[in-house]
Amino acid sequence: MSFTITHRTGDMEVGPSIDGLLALVDELDRDDPEHPDVAVSHESGWTLSAYPEGLIAWENVEQDGEPRHMRHVARERLIELFTEVALGHLETVEREAWAAGYP
């Protein structure tokens, strides 16, 4: 399974180490209103994006479908979810308590 990370600057890395996910989450600590999020994308198009305030969004950017979101997600939980996406465990992420649409 292949995955891509999107840094806060917009730069992308294909197939990075899973160990780099902690550093990706740490990027949320920088103040950058122009680039507010980081993301992990599975090769199938499923993408989990995270914002500094604990907001995350889950959507398939390759297919039509309703995006979903959660608020107040702790950093530790975010790292777990990013890891699940990177490993291709999409059904685990799907089972989360998502709210419909974008916030």
Task: Label each region the model flagged.
Residues 68-103:
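Mixed-charge, Lys/Arg-enriched low-complexity segments
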Residues 42, 51-54, 100-103:
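Polar/charged, Gly/Pro-rich intrinsically disordered segments
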